């Protein structure tokens, strides 16, 4: 820790306070995340340190780099590259009545999918994707922050400040208590973020787990074993759920063209194995008119 100096507190993340800092000898500006864990007395579990240290291997232009993992008096500090703006702040800054440029929506979505595909190939899930952990710079680059932290530290119900962790981007299999879930959870979250890029409004903004589920069901229909095999045997599925028909996705996301709506619908398929993968999504016709050679990952993909 003596290599870094804290400049200012910049926010409160899921796991603790986030500071802007600087490396004393190189001058590099960094984000310093102080991890506060539930069991403060026992210190940081070695499994968490091991898990999180593996994340230093994730090097991709659309994934925020974890530069260092440091311990100080049984506190864990994660040192990340610094970006000053997140997607939520950016969307909030767009004046009323105006929307993101459709090509920027397309570019951001493609870059998010690149970052997700890169991590999924390496067996790393995010599990808590939301606009607050998508960071942007002033050159049109978007990067995913906090990849892999959920596995290292769990996804808390409440932030350490007692603010409830948002459910708006959470996949239905997680909300229904599925004990096994995989990479499709991140694709669902990305789909809901895609809709929000287009409309500036969260697609499903529930204020409890049941309200969240019912908002999804009202839009896409209440799932059953016909559309999603074995959904009715998930721990939190109730046969008493109202049977909504759904089918109102296009009326809720008016700013997307036919290809955009088709891709969104494929990202929001209930049955996880049938949901489009990040890799498949990148080849969807929606992206045909995107110049991928200008994107930050072009150099590593050989586009």
Curated annotation (Swiss-Prot):
Q: Residues where Phosphothreonine occurs?
A: 14, 161
Q: Which domain of life is it from?
A: Eukaryota
Q: Which named protein is this?
A: Cyclin-dependent kinase 1
- What is its subcellular localisation? Nucleus; Cytoplasm, Cytoskeleton, Microtubule organizing center, Centrosome
For the modification Phosphotyrosine, the affected residues are 15
Regarding how it is modified after translation, the entry says: Phosphorylation at Tyr-15 by wee1 and wee2 inhibits the protein kinase activity and acts negative regulator of entry into mitosis (G2 to M transition).
Q: How is its activity regulated?
A: Phosphorylation at Thr-14 or Tyr-15 inactivates the enzyme, while phosphorylation at Thr-161 activates it.
Alphabetical list of InterPro entries matching this protein: CDK (IPR050108), Kinase-like_dom_sf (IPR011009), Prot_kinase_dom (IPR000719), Protein_kinase_ATP_BS (IPR017441), Ser/Thr_kinase_AS (IPR008271)
Q: Which residues bind ATP?
A: 10-18, 33
Recorded GO cellular component terms are: centrosome; cytoplasm; nucleus
Subunit details: Forms a stable but non-covalent complex with cyclin B in mature oocytes.
Q: Which GO terms describe its molecular function?
A: ATP binding; cyclin-dependent protein serine/threonine kinase activity; protein serine kinase activity; RNA polymerase II CTD heptapeptide repeat kinase activity
Indicate the family of this protein.
Belongs to the protein kinase superfamily. CMGC Ser/Thr protein kinase family. CDC2/CDKX subfamily.
């Amino acid at each position: 820790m003596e290599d870094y100096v804290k400049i200012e507190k910049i926010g409160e993340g899921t796991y603790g306070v986030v500071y802007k800092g600087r490396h004393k000898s190189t001058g590099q500006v960094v984000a310093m995340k102080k991890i506060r864990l539930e069991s403060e007395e026992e210190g940081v579990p070695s499994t968490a340190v091991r898990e999180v240290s593996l994340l230093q291997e994730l090097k991709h232009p659309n994934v925020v780099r974890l530069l260092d993992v440091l311990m100080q008096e049984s506190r864990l500090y994660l040192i990340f590259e610094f970006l000053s703006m997140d997607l939520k702040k950016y969307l909030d800054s767009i004046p009323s009545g105006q929307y993101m440029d459709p090509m920027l929506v397309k570019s951001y979505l493609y870059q998010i999918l690149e970052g997700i595909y890169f991590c999924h190939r390496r067996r790393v899930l995010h599990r808590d994707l939301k606009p607050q952990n998508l960071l942007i710079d002033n050159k049109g680059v978007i990067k995913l922050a906090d990849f892999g932290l959920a596995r290292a530290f769990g996804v808390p119900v409440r932030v350490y400040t007692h603010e409830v962790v948002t459910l708006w981007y959470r996949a239905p299999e997680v909300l229904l208590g599925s004990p096994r879930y995989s990479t499709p959870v991140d694709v669902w979250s990305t789909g809901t973020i895609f809709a929000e890029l287009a409309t500036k409004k969260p697609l499903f903004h529930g204020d409890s787990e049941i309200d969240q589920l019912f908002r999804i069901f009202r839009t896409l229909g209440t799932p059953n074993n016909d559309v999603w095999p074995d959904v009715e045997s998930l721990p939190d599925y109730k046969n008493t759920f109202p049977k909504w028909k759904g089918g109102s996705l296009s009326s809720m996301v008016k700013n997307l063209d036919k290809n955009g709506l088709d891709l969104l619908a494929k990202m929001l398929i209930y049955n996880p194995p049938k949901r489009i993968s990040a890799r498949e999504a990148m080849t969807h016709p929606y992206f045909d008119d995107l110049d991928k050679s200008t994107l930050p990952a072009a150099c590593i993909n050989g586009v």
